[in-house]
Amino acid sequence: MTLPIRTLDLPSLSLRDALDLAVLVDEEAKERYEELADQLELHHTPEAASFFRFMANNEEKHRLELASRRRHLFADSPSTVHRGMIFDVEAPDYSEAAIFMTPRQALAVARRSEEKAHGFFVELLAEIKEPEVAALFAELRDEEILHQELIDREIAKLPPDEPFAAADFADEPVSH
C-alpha cells in the first residue's frame, strides 16, 4: 500500500501535526459517509443509507475527540497539515455505493474502510521516529481493530442477503 498522503515529512512529524492529520482523516471519512448516504437515499435504499449516517456520526464523534485533544495540548496554534495532503485514507470509495444495496453490503463497505485505515496507521508507524507520535498512531491503529469488531458484531445480527440481487428484478429505465 502506498500511503495516501502527500508532502508530509513523516519521520519528523510533530504530535500537533499528527493530531491534525488524524482529525482530517476522520473529517474526510465522515463527509464521504454522508455523501454515500445521500446517494443511497436517492436510490431508495434507506437501510443502507441509515448505516452510513451512523458511520458518519461515529467519525464525527471521533474527530471532535481528537480536535479537543489537539486544542488542549496546542491551543490555537496554526496547523501545517491540510486536506490537500490526504486522500481516501479511511473514506469509502465513491464506487462502493450501489442501488439496491443491502445493510449487509453497507456494513461490508464500512469494514473495508476500517481495514484500509488500519493499514494506513500500520504503514505510518513504520515511518515515525517521535515516540509521542508513534503512541498516537498506535492508539489509532488499535481503534481501527475495535471498529472492525463492532462492524463484525453488527453483520452477525443481520439475516443473510437474499440469494438473488434486487437489481436482477428491477425494471429497465424508461425513455420518453
Annotated model-derived regions:
Residues 1-176:
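Iron-associated oxidoreductase/ferritin-like identity signal
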